[in-house]
């Protein structure tokens, strides 16, 4: 019975694969499920301006369009070979777009890395229903070998193999060494003199959003693919979504016009790239022994070293596991590893600073990027915030909450290790006139919805009930796709599920985002988080900082909620809306007005009239006409005489 189920399942998967993988041809693959009309419209919209966008952005461009759904949102990545001519690049992309439309009329994903008809330029185009930005993508892959055999051209295949491997290694090292001055930073073209032939040409390129280590890995996979499957051919190309490799006995893409020839390399006894023979005819027996025996010895040494390194890393990186009272575990990191990862907490690695310490970027030995929060020594409440955040984030998992990877409490250090979020925090965008232009209404709406989902999880959907107590723009991190992640749970409070509010004698947080009942009396609830959400929402709509507004209009001591409320009731809506926000085909002016309405409902002085985060998310997700309560006056706050922490 078990075997029958396995066979049936395997056959079903095969049928599904044959159904979804509709087209494969020289450097071109269509795959995935069939898309709907909205997905097709989004794809057409992105394709319409893609060639010009690639050229105007230095040869590499990525974008996404559509509602935040795998069924509607399209992500596209495109690039040209470095050193391209602008018109040749545009023409190449225009051709591949037309091919994509005709050969992939209904499928959600496509990948191609092709050349124009004259072999003058290469370009790559990929679209998917998920973001690939910054991710190593090895599949699908295509291999296009030269149909002719190389055996007839070389008498000594062993010598050719050694020289070929040396050339490939040199090209690979150069391509995977990032040149930060160029958008197309991972690239190398080499022209090498061989003993038995005048020139051999090799070219490698990676998409520029990879790490150097991932670029190198991708290119090695391409080289190994060719060696395993088509060794003995007179050249060929291997392409993957993240990288491309080609070698030939003649120049191509006009990539070698200004490349200086490298003299024939000295013979090598071994290589870091494994060499595979195509068949017995390609090598004589003695030559096989020359190549294979050293390779096997090196492989054994390599495996032993890797095993030893892995054992060492398992003890070095994580030397303990922290168990919370509820049986949850959290990784404890070694201090020496964190010091190394952050370059001894150098200024170059510093990302920012908060009330309880500084945040640094780090890179683990595995290549994983991390964010390291180092709590300030002598900060008074640092120890409490440290323990609070570890205990809470150990038990919370949500796409809109920052992920805590582990901690370190070695010696007198208290350190938290998070996933690295590349686009920093929301305040770096919303309060900067240049960066704010990136925040189209589509992006702003996505961020607002994401923060609301994160709060809903904290307030209602997790096993706990948590009040954040310090929700603000600087505590909203943005990933590579500008999706928000709520961060900084050091001040959060844990409630039992039947509790609805609490009171504290130690008021902590950021003035301007605090609900009036919390700032004045220390009373907090889910509705105090809603108030903070409302202030942040109004900041995103207006592009104005609550603090900056106070300084600009100091005489009136008018905060942002009051500023928006007055103009709302007077009908002066244009003064509320950020003039730098780019228009959107998806978000109408009515949607923007709805956002203002929701923001004002959140910052009402009467706690009972503020909506729950569940209601807010319901309103945000309904794009038809909806009925919402009429907002009542907001809290008119003046700076209190009390000091925070009373």
Swiss-Prot record:
Where are the Cytoplasmic topological domains? 309-646
Membrane topology classification: Single-pass membrane protein
Q: Which residues carry this modification: Phosphothreonine?
A: 510
Subcellular localization, as worded in the UniProt entry: Membrane
Its recorded reaction(s) are: L-seryl-[protein] + ATP = O-phospho-L-seryl-[protein] + ADP + H(+); L-threonyl-[protein] + ATP = O-phospho-L-threonyl-[protein] + ADP + H(+)
Q: Which SMART domains match?
A: S_TKc
Q: Which cysteines are joined by disulfide bonds?
A: none
Protein kinase domain location is 345-626
Modified sites of kind Phosphotyrosine: 418, 518
Q: Keywords of this protein's UniProt record, alphabetized? A: ATP-binding, Glycoprotein, Kinase, Membrane, Nucleotide-binding, Phosphoprotein, Receptor, Repeat, Serine/threonine-protein kinase, Signal, Transferase, Transmembrane, Transmembrane helix
> Keyword NADP: yes or no?
no
Q: What is this protein called?
A: Cysteine-rich receptor-like protein kinase 37
Instruction: Specify the taxonomic lineage.
Output: Eukaryota, Viridiplantae, Streptophyta, Embryophyta, Tracheophyta
This chain is encoded by the gene named CRK37
